[in-house]
Swiss-Prot record:
The keyword Isomerase does not apply. One of its GO terms (biological process) is membrane fusion involved in viral entry into host cell. This is Envelope protein A28 homolog. It comes from Molluscum contagiosum virus subtype 1 (MOCV). It is a single-pass type II membrane protein. Keywords: Disulfide bond, Fusion of virus membrane with host membrane, Late protein, Membrane, Signal-anchor, Transmembrane, Transmembrane helix, Viral envelope protein, Viral penetration into host cytoplasm, Virion, Virus entry into host cell. Its main location: virion. InterPro entries: Poxvirus_A28 (IPR007664). The chain crosses the membrane at residues 1-21.
Length: 141
């Protein structure tokens, strides 16, 4: 046998061994595979979860941030929720901090596709009029 034939014989033997190992792995785990398929069969042809679902994987303001204090989060401020970060709070068009009645509303806004370009930072107020907001912001970071 020439060396080229030996090489192809070794490659073919390795391919057959790999296929046999994969078949054995499926055989050993077949019960688990059936259990998984039964548990997730209802999702096989589904296109979406339905309702007012927001895909939070498309836009996440924390993806490009390495510093943990700069990551956006929803925090309970009194009886309302606010979106907070080292940059400040997400703001209303009039410049006041944006508040949410539920945590889900806050999460949907913060990690949804809403306009998040307005930010107000109470710690940069030279008059110190927003000292309470600044203290809260520093406490949640």
């Amino acid at each position: 046998m020439d060396p080229l034939s030996v090489f192809f014989l070794v490659v073919a033997a390795a391919a057959v061994c790999t296929l046999l190992l994969q078949a054995y792995a499926v055989y050993e785990n077949f019960d688990s595979i059936l259990e998984f398929n039964d548990a997730h069969a209802s999702l096989e042809y589904s296109k979406s979860l339905g309702g007012s679902y927001i895909d939070k994987h498309v836009f996440d303001p924390n993806d490009g941030v390495a510093d943990v204090t700069q990551k956006w989060r929803c925090a309970l401020y009194g009886k309302v929720y606010v979106s907070a970060s080292a940059f400040g709070f997400y703001a209303q068009p009039d410049g006041s901090k944006r508040t949410f009645s539920t945590r889900d509303d806050c999460v949907d806004f913060t990690f949804g596709t809403a306009d998040t370009s307005r930010v107000v930072n109470p710690c940069t107020d030279p008059n110190g009029a927003q000292a309470e907001d600044c203290a809260f912001l520093k406490s949640v970071l």
